[in-house]
Every structure is written in structure tokens, then in C-alpha cells.
Amino acid sequence: MRKINVFDTSLRDGEQMPGIALTVKEKLEIARQLERLGVDIIEAGFPASSPGDFQAVKEIAETVKGSSITGLARAKKSDIDSAWEALKSSAEPRVHVFLATSPIHMEHKLKLTPDQVVERAVESVRYAAEKFPHVQFSAEDANRSEWPFLKRIIEAAIDAGASVINLPDTVGYRTPEEISKLFEFVTENVKNIDRAILSTHNHDDLGMGVANSLAAISAGAGQVECTINGIGERAGNAALEEIAVALQIRSDYYQAKTGLKLSELKRTSALVSRLTSMNVPGNKAVVGANAFAHESGIHQDGMLKNKETYEIITPELVGATSSLPLGKHSGRHAFKTKLNELGFSGSDEKLQTIFSAFKQLCDKKKEVTEDDLYALIADATDDQDSTAYELTALQVTYGMNHVPTATIRLKKQDDREIEEAGTGSGSVEAIYNTLAKMTGGNYSLADYRIQSVNGGEDALAEVHVRIQADDFEQSGRGVAHDVLEASAKAYLHAVNRVIARKHYAKREMAKVES
């Protein structure tokens, strides 16, 4: 049975999704979880695109050793040099060089002739191969490229040193049948294809990203590029969890498998969802809240008699089962053991912070579940360097015939406390108007979402917001037993991240000028 390499691009292509802006520490946390999942290759970012991306790729390359780390680079020596500086400490450095090959891209974007495109591809791949032991060449918009030209440039790239050839459906246009024909053509007609691994990368614009990826695997692809929860620009990318489970459940058909630890899928999905503030739909295949729910009486009866009547995927396979909940009598050692099982690897100081929050929650809830713990971990592991303001007190007064008023106290980084009151048409607006006044930012609320971490009257509230700040959007999240407190925390989290992002940009600009 063939082994399919899994190339996760959640931290690069996935982060291009509008509203996602991860910090370096958040990217590192996701990368560590991808390593635990068993991902073969992690595309950590685009080092030449910004100082922040460079730093994230560099830190991930220095920290994660169980997966191969790669970075994106245009077919330019400066991009490849930047990628090398960021990735050279990786256990197995590799670079992902891309160049457009479709007529529309060559003519209107690159403004190059086909001969010039081949020349640039060869030059860049050869240069990259002098530095990196593994070079991947992507023919951008391959699925709208002319096949004879595609054959020519693939052969040239392999001769120049490319060990992986990626054929992306950049705009999500093709059908599974068309993808199959393309990969069969390349496999049968590219004379030196035996010296490279074929890779597939599919977008989901027509809802066929996963189907196209599986079709490519059937037609000879040995590597699949995908993202957790299918995140990505426009309609997103092919979802890693769906591809992996499809190959597992239908191994009889595909005769292929991954090396993933599938029991980490649910945990990985939850982490990415929380850090990106992108909710997973309840009916999402494999990792959605309803993926293993059966409401129909006939279905429930069948499930009680034999689970295989209506369940082709077990919750245990993807790690969707909930273990026994913790309670107020649980000790620190048992709590630490449980957090380690969930993938937490923070300092003792951070552990104590989460443990204290856990004990406070136990006073309000009879049972604390894994979902609660995930929320507490996410709330406590934010980058402390970005905490310009901390919420210390919140009081909201409202009634049917009264104007909602919020009184808020914040602590600044220098430990000074400030207090302010403000009004709004509703309680949440009163809170946000007051916070905007206190932080001095000209922010507009782009999105506000609330969800309970789990069911029940005593459930934790988790609020996700996106605020518009100048020319970019920034997400924030807040968790609390009270929805108004969670709302305040979410807004403040987003504001703190905006401030940290601006300070970082100023520091990098100062370095350049000096």
C-alpha cells in the first residue's frame, strides 16, 4: 500500500483567509500540534513576505524536529536566500519554489514568454538545490496550463534538482475526472517523473477540493497539500482531516495510507479553530459537533443494535470521545497529566494560571469537560508580550427603560489602572464603546460571534470578534462564565493584538533604518 506524504499549509495558505492573523507563538503552538498529529511536511510561512513571517518560520524550524519544515519562495534568488536563513536550522530543510505556468498568468502577471518562464524556473530550482536537500517546484495554476508546456517545464525543473513537483488547482476550477487525466498525463509522458514525487494542491471554490485531492492520489500523486478545517483564502483549501479519514476508511479503494495519528485530528481541529477564531460548522465532516450525532429514531434504534448500521467512522478514530470530566476535588498532578494529554507543554507558571482558572470554574460548574479545558488553555496561553491592557473590573447596568451603561477598569503594562464608563444601545455596545474610549483606538466591529463551550446552563461562554484597524482586520477571543465578561475579554484581546502588531512593525522598521 502506497504511503502518501501529508503537506500541511494551514500556517501559510490557510492564514491567508480573511480575518486570520496569528502571532508567532500561536503559529508555533499549531506547528507543535501538527507534529503530534504526524504531519510529514509543515509549510510554516512565506519568509520573504514579512519580518513576522520570517520569524515564525525560523522559530518553528528551530523547535519542531519531528516534521520537515518548509517555506514558500517565489522563483527569485532573494526569496530563496530568505527561506534558507529561516529554515537552515530545520532537521530536514526544504523550500517550496513556485512560478505561474498558465497562459493567462504568464502573459498578464509575469509578462514573460514561455521560454523565459522555463529559464527562470530552471535558474531558481538549480539555485535552491545548491542550498536545500529538498526542493519542491509548484507550477502555479497548473490546471489551466497547456499540457505540452507543463510537460516541458516539469522535465526541466526535475533536471535542475526538484524532488517534488506540485500541480495546484489554484482557483478550484477542475473536476475530479479532469484532475485524474492531468496526473495520468504527467505520469505517462514526463520522461523523468520517476525522479520526483507528484503533489496535489486543491482549492475548494466549487466544493471539490477534497474530491480532487483524492482523485489525484488515485492517479499517482504521492503528496497531498491541505489545511486543517479546510481554512484558506476564498472558499478555502482541501481539508486535511477529510482526506486522511477517507484514505483510512476507503483504503480498499485507494490502496494508499498516511502516517498520521488520526486520534489527534479532533484536538488539532479544535486548536486551529480557537486560535484562528474560525468556528467549525456543526455538520462538518469528521470534526463537526454533529459528525457522530444521530437524531432520527430509526437511526438511533439501529445504532443501539449495532453501531455499524449508520456509523462508518468511529469517534475514537479521530479522537472525538470525551474522557471522564475533572471536578473540584481533582489535584494539581492529575490536572497537569490531563493537560499534557491534551497537548499542553507550557511552563509551570502558565500551568498554575490555568489551574487557578480551573478551580474558579469548578466553583461554578459541577463538571469541567475537555472542551472547557481547551478554552481555559487558549485563554491563558495568549502572548503576554501583547497584553497592553488587562481587564480587572467590569460592571454593566441595564433594564427595559434604562440606557445600558458599562463601567470598566483596566490595568496597563506599567501597572497603572484606569477607569471609565460609557453607554450604548445594548450591553455589548456599551462595553465596546467604553473600551474604545479607554484604549484610544479608532476600531470598528467587523464580526461578533458567541458560542457555549459545551451544553448546559453552567456552560462557559466563548466570544470571537474581529475588529477593523486601519487597513487590516484583527481577531480576538474571550472565555468566561458570563457572556458580557467574555465579550469584553474578546474585544480587549483583539485590541492588544493590534497594538502588538503595530509595535512589532515599528521595531522592524527601526532595524531596517539603522
From Swiss-Prot:
Record protein name field: 2-isopropylmalate synthase
Family: Belongs to the alpha-IPM synthase/homocitrate synthase family. LeuA type 1 subfamily.
Gene3D superfamilies recorded: 1.10.238.260, 3.30.160.270, Aldolase class I
Cofactor(s) in the UniProt record: Mn(2+)
EC number, as in UniProt: 2.3.3.13
Protein keywords: Amino-acid biosynthesis, Branched-chain amino acid biosynthesis, Cytoplasm, Leucine biosynthesis, Manganese, Metal-binding, Transferase
Record field: catalytic activity: 3-methyl-2-oxobutanoate + acetyl-CoA + H2O = (2S)-2-isopropylmalate + CoA + H(+)
Protein source organism: Shouchella clausii (strain KSM-K16)
PROSITE patterns: AIPM_HOMOCIT_SYNTH_1, AIPM_HOMOCIT_SYNTH_2, PYR_CT
Signal peptide start and end residues: none
